[in-house]
A protein has these predicted regions:
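C-terminal accessory domains and tails appended to enzymatic cores
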Residues: 2, 8-19, 177, 183-302
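Short acidic, glycine/proline-rich loop/turn micro-motifs
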Residues: 63-66, 178-182
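Conserved acidic residues
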Residues: 89, 121, 165
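Short beta-strand-loop elements within alpha/beta enzyme cores
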Residues: 110-133, 283, 287
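Short mixed-charge
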Residues: 149-163
Length: 302
């Protein structure tokens, strides 16, 4: 007896074992993607779907001591560690320098060709309102390419996609306009691996970012691990305590759950949703295929 297929647009879901979806997560810098979407990536991978990361610059500006060339080399090595942990292909535009991503026509064509070649069902990237010019430019490039993905005469050397992908924007704390959590994902089961991915970016979390904030980093590895987390998040830690905390990556990921507690309860129910400690969140872009009540759980089945 053949397996039953449920069809949503161009997405075929095998109800006894899903056909692969393709998920493309586009970030400006090495670390942007896993800091925001490592938990979701693990959930997609566990279900047998394919996830690819694309970074639009080489990160060579992210250090205060190393040369740009050495910084790019170190950061590429850090991404390779993450790729191994998560089991993803992690591509980098190595010819683009940090702080120099531009939403040019040339880059629009380059990104359009890349997306068409991969043919993803879902794209995730930054929002346009962001403090960093590279984040804004990356978001602008994705937005500019979105409709063109299905236009055959634009970049005719790369076959146009048959249907636009769902385009999602990754969580941030900016207020103008404020982030809206259209998709929330509890990641308590994935948090330790996500923190392991964060620790891969040693040049950033222990060197460059503390330097920019005037922070002193402990010397021993054990102390660094605790310092990096910021605080212990337990079942008794309240959302108010989490939101009041000032630093740390455990705190950062717990604050997403605290901010969007209402949405987590709506999705998972009161008993489970109220207890989720760590979460990731996504905002739907109006420039891609739209999520509906009928297809939302198909695209985000966790």
């Amino acid at each position: 007896m053949s397996d039953i297929l449920t069809v949503y647009g161009n997405l075929f879901i095998n109800t006894k074992g899903a056909n692969k979806m393709k998920v493309l997560i586009i970030g400006a810098h090495e670390d942007d993607i896993e800091f925001r979407n490592a938990g979701m990536t693990m959930k997609f991978k566990e279900l047998g779907h394919d996830v690819r990361f694309l970074c639009l610059c080489n990160g060579n500006g992210g250090h205060h001591i190393l040369s740009p060339e050495e910084t790019a080399r170190v950061r590429k090595g850090e991404t390779q560690q993450v790729a191994k942990i998560l089991g993803v292909q992690y591509d980098i535009w190595e010819d683009v320098s940090d702080c120099e991503i531009e939403p040019t026509l040339e880059n629009r064509k380059r990104l359009t060709r890349y997306i068409r070649e991969y043919n993803p069902d879902i794209i995730c990237t930054h929002r346009i309102n962001d403090y960093h010019a590279d984040h804004r430019a990356t978001a602008q490039l994705v937005q500019d390419a979105s409709y063109l993905l299905i236009v055959p005469h634009f970049c005719p050397d790369a076959p146009a996609m048959k249907e636009m992908p769902v385009i999602m924007q990754t969580v941030d704390a900016f207020k103008n306009p404020e982030f809206r959590a259209d998709v929330v994902i509890g990641i308590d089961d994935e948090i330790e691996t996500k923190l392991e991915c964060v620790r891969c970016h040693r040049s950033q979390i222990y060197e460059w970012l503390p330097y920019t904030k005037g922070e002193t980093v402990p010397e021993s590895e054990e102390e660094r691990r605790e310092w990096m987390k910021g605080m212990d998040i337990t079942a008794d830690t309240t959302d108010e305590e989490v939101l009041a905390a000032k630093r740390g990556y455990s705190v950062r990921f717990a604050q997403v759950a605290a901010r969007f507690r209402k949405e987590l309860i709506e999705k998972y129910g009161e008993e489970k949703g109220s207890k989720i400690r760590y979460a990731e969140a996504l905002m739907l872009s109006e420039y891609g295929k739209q999520l509906t009540d009928e297809n939302k759980d198909t695209y985000f089945p966790f």
